[in-house]
Every structure is written in C-alpha cells, then in structure tokens.
C-alpha cells in the first residue's frame, strides 16, 4: 500500500514538473534587422555603428546589405526584404508622389544621417571653359560643348536629392533643362559611364566626384554645400511595419546611429572611418580619395587646385543640427517637384510631410539621448534661390527661377 502511495506521489510530482517545463517560455532571440546601403561615403553612420559594435550595444542584431541602386533600395524597403536603409532624403517624397515609384506607397523618414558632401562633376570637355563654382559661366560652357555634341547629365534617382541639386544648379546657371539630356545612373557606376562618354556631367555623392578627379576623367565644378549649406542629404528611411510594429527596435537602431554620427564628427576619427569605408563590402573606392573629401579637402581636378571646406564639409551630427528630420525640408523638395515640372499641380505639402516624417519618434529618441531637436517650419534660403517659407509655398513658386 505504501509502495503504491509512493508511486502515486512520484507520478504526480513528475507530472507537475513536466507541466512546469512545458509552460516555461524560452526567450526568443532578437530578430535580425536588415538595413540596406549604397556605396557612398555618407553610408558611414551605418558602417560605423556596425564596426564599433553600437547596434549590439543597444541590443539589436543588424545586418548591413549592400544594394546596387536606389531603385533596388526602394523596392526592398517596400516589399519588406529590408527593414530600412541609408537613403536619399527626398526619395520617400518622390515615390509617394508618383515620380520615383507607384504613387501612394509609403516609406518613412526616421532621421537625417548627414548634411553636405555631394557634388557636380563635369567631364574634361568643360575643362578650361568653366571652373570651380563659376556658375555664371556654366550656360555658355554648355552651349560651347553642344556645338560639338549633345550634352547629357546624370543623376541617381528621379526626384532624389542629386536630381534636385542638379536642377537647382541649372536654374541658377540659366541652363534650359529641356535642352540637355538628364538620365539616371546608380552612384557607383558614374565614373565608368563618364569614362566611356555616356554623359558630360553628373551629380552624385562622394567619393565618386573625387574618384573622377583623381582618375583625370572629370573635375568638381561645384559641391552641394555651395548650393545649399548644411542641406539634408541621406536619411534613415524605413518601411511602415518597422516604424509601427517594431518601434522599440527602431528606436534602438536610431540611438546606435546617432552615437555613430557623434563619433564621425570627431575629425580624428575620420581616418579610421575611411579605412572601413574603403573595403570591398562597403564603398570599395581608394582610401585616399574617401579620406581627403571626408576631411573637407577637395582636389578638384583639371588643374583647379585644392578646395578646403572648413565647416561645411560632410557632417553627421554637428552639435545636433544634422539629425532632426524636418517637415519644412520635405515641403521644400515637394515644391521643387512643382518648380521643375515633375508635378503639374500642388500636392498636399503639409499632409505628405506629416505622413512621411517621423518627427515625433525622433523627438522621443533625441530626448532619451540628450540630443537637441531643431526648430522646424521656419523660412530659410539656399545660395542661389529666393527665400523659402514652408507656410507659403505659392509665394516661393511665383518668384523662383525655373
């Protein structure tokens, strides 16, 4: 009887233990977050966050994925193959308005990654005809070259930042944009295409302007910071699911990137950053070209000498000025689409900006990181254009050059 009782107690105890085991939930490992990038110097915040272990520090497992073009980045963000990417600030605006994709598709702008650091490169056809920042001579130079052949310029994505810098330069120079060809070429392919005479000029990010000068294929005519000092350039752009369902993970990613941006703005760290960027799995361009322009030293090519940028080279943090995603900047890009004929009527400027800019999320992250949030919706002016008031786009469009 006692033996039977002991066996019963043993079975009950074992059953209880097994029940405890089966009900115990083993924590699931953190999912891998995939972020895309293009081979450009300004992918540095993502690369640095990875190489310094900052993503791991903030508790996220991030895989960086090198992409072939901005169109591929767009498609992978939208279909969920990647969670987000180093991306042209204006690309979500271009896609949403139907310029660079199917209208109504949403990609969210979480934060700005950098200011400045792009340029317009002209081919050797222009060498000796127009020099560095000689915008007033550019139209005559184009006509000069057109006397020998058709002139084509390249940018990287319709409605993207490079497209808009190129068109702003043309407007300032008085170049009729319908008199030249404008084509789309992925950033890493710019130099090769100029080498085989597929275009006479292009607008792209570094290091591909510096590489053209170093290889004596073209020269730097003007940098983007000369067109608009401290302009927004690349952004962390994410799909809607990452911005909502995985909001806490996104915040961790943003914190890691902000710390990387701070690290990058210590000039003494830029040589190390360049040594990472030069690797084949990242930018795959000459170390000396990446490093020099990252430090603000531009060997222009065409025997034009070296231009030293003292405070408006490529910046990633700049005491907190860089990273706030601004609705006013989004509205400016939307206004450019109307200005240059991409859109035939005014879009819902504020509505689109509010839909695509994650300014509230950035404010949360900034507060937790003690990063200042910059004021928004204020008027500002670019170098060659009239003042832009985001609250009165109509007045701007009446007076700006087209």
Language-model features, listed with the residues they occupy:
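Bacterial N-terminal signal peptides that target proteins for export
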Residues: 1-10
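Bacterial N-terminal signal peptides
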Residues: 9-20
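Short, glycine-/small- and polar/acidic-enriched structural segments
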Residues: 26-177, 181-183, 196-212, 217-230, ...
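Soluble non-cytosolic domains of exported or imported proteins
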Residues: 40, 67-71, 86, 157-161, ...
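Short glycine- and hydrophobic/aromatic-rich loop-to-beta-strand nucleating segment
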Residues: 120-121, 235-238, 242-243
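Secondary-structure end/capping motifs
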Residues: 245-358
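Conserved C-terminal helix/tail region of periplasmic/extracytoplasmic solute-binding proteins
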Residues: 331-402
């Amino acid at each position: 009887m006692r033996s039977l009782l002991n066996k019963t107690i043993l079975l009950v105890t074992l059953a209880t233990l097994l029940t405890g085991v089966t009900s115990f939930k083993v924590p699931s490992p953190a999912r891998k977050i995939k972020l895309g990038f293009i081979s450009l110097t300004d992918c540095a915040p993502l690369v640095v966050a990875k190489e310094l272990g900052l993503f791991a520090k903030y508790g996220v497992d991030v895989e960086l994925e090198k992409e072939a073009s901005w169109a591929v980045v767009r498609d992978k963000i939208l279909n969920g193959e990647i969670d987000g990417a180093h991306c042209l600030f204006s690309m979500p605006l271009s896609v949403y308005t139907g310029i660079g994709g199917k209208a109504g598709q949403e990609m969210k702008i979480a934060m700005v990654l950098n200011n400045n650091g792009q340029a317009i490169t002209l081919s050797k056809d222009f060498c000796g005809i127009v020099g560095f920042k000689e915008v007033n001579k550019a139209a005559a130079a184009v006509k000069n070259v057109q006397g020998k052949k058709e002139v084509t310029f390249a940018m990287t994505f319709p409605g993207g930042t490079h497209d808009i810098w190129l068109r702003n330069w043309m407007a300032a120079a008085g170049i009729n944009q319908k008199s030249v060809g404008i084509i789309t070429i992925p950033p890493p392919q710019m130099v090769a295409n100029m080498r085989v005479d597929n275009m006479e000029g292009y607008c792209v990010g570094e290091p591909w302007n510096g590489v053209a000068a170093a290889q004596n294929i073209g020269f730097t005519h003007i940098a983007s910071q000369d067109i608009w000092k401290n302009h927004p350039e690349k952004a962390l752009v994410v799909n809607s699911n990452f911005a909502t369902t995985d909001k806490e993970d996104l915040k961790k990613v943003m914190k890691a990137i902000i710390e990387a941006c701070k690290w990058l703005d210590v000039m003494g760290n830029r040589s190390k950053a360049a040594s990472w960027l030069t690797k084949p799995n990242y930018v795959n361009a000459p170390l000396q070209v990446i490093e020099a322009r990252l430090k603000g030293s531009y060997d222009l090519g065409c025997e034009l000498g070296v231009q030293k940028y003292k405070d408006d080279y490529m910046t990633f943090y700049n005491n907190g000025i860089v990273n706030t995603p601004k609705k006013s900047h989004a509205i400016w890009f939307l206004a450019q689409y109307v200005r240059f004929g991409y859109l035939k009527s005014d879009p819902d400027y504020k509505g689109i900006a509010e839909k695509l800019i994650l300014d509230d999320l950035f404010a949360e992250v900034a507060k937790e990181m003690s990063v200042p949030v910059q004021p928004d919706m204020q008027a500002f002016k670019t170098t060659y254009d009239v003042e832009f008031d985001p609250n009165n786009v109509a007045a701007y469009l009446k007076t700006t050059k087209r």
